């Protein structure tokens, strides 16, 4: 199933000059949502044995939890600061204008665990790379990355380790 028809393009959101990819029409459609999860799951076949799906706030929670259920794995959320009770691991990363931070429960993952990191969109790659650093801090290993949409013109993959498999369902070349 071609999922592009379910992605709504919203110009100048959340800021002028941004073309937002709205996945809510996809989530609303049972067949489309199921196909998206199946296509994400198919991409994990090259990632070896996995223990957990790590979902990045916030749309990565939706896709990640559904993918975890589909694969029979546990789900671990990565959140913005102040959303998880302590103890947490923290990782700062650069934005276009400043810094941001992500957090992971300190005991959510253990050494030897293997995870796939999931988000709806890979744009600049900053949040995915920061999440991979959080996973490494925990002693776990990133087995792969899975994204619904890649904004290829932003070259976000360059921040991801090239030796780790990255699966993308849809590549968007337009800006």
From Swiss-Prot:
Q: What class of enzyme is it?
A: transferase
- Matching PROSITE patterns: PUR_PYR_PR_TRANSFER
Q: How does it assemble?
A: Homodimer.
According to its UniProt record, where is this protein mainly located?
Answer: cytoplasm
Which PANTHER family does the entry link to?
ADENINE PHOSPHORIBOSYLTRANSFERASE (PTHR32315:SF3)
Protein name, as recorded: Adenine phosphoribosyltransferase
Annotated GO molecular function terms are: adenine binding; adenine phosphoribosyltransferase activity; AMP binding
Which cysteines are disulphide-bonded? none
Q: Which UniProt keywords apply?
A: Cytoplasm, Glycosyltransferase, Purine salvage, Transferase
Q: Which GO terms describe its biological process?
A: adenine salvage; AMP salvage; purine ribonucleoside salvage
The keyword Transferase appears for this protein: yes
> Could you tell me the EC number(s) of this protein?
2.4.2.7
Functional note? Catalyzes a salvage reaction resulting in the formation of AMP, that is energically less costly than de novo synthesis.
Gene Ontology CC, one term: cytoplasm
Q: Which Pfam families match?
A: Pribosyltran
| Record InterPro entries | Ade_phspho_trans, PRibTrfase_dom, PRTase-like, UPRTase/APRTase
**Which branch of life, at top level?**
Bacteria
Q: Which family does it belong to?
A: Belongs to the purine/pyrimidine phosphoribosyltransferase family.
Location(s), subcellular: Cytoplasm
């Amino acid at each position: 199933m071609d999922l592009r028809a379910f992605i709504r393009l919203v110009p100048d959101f959340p800021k002028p000059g941004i073309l937002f990819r709205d996945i809510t029409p996809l989530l609303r459609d049972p067949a489309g949502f199921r196909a998206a999860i199946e296509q994400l799951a198919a991409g994990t076949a090259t990632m070896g044995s996995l223990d957990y799906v790590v979902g990045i706030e916030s749309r990565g929670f939706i896709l990640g939890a559904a993918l975890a259920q589909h694969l029979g794995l546990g789900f671990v959320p990565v959140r913005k600061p102040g959303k998880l009770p302590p103890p947490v691991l923290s990782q700062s990363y650069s934005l276009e204008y400043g810094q941001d931070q992500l957090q992971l429960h300190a005991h959510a993952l253990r050494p030897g665990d293997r995870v796939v990191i999931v988000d709806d969109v890979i744009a600049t790659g900053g949040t995915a790379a920061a999440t991979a650093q959080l996973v490494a801090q925990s002693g776990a290993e990133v087995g792969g990355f899975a994204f619904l949409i890649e904004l290829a013109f932003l070259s976000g993959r360059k921040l991801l380790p090239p030796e780790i498999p990255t699966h993308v369902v849809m590549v968007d070349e337009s800006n």
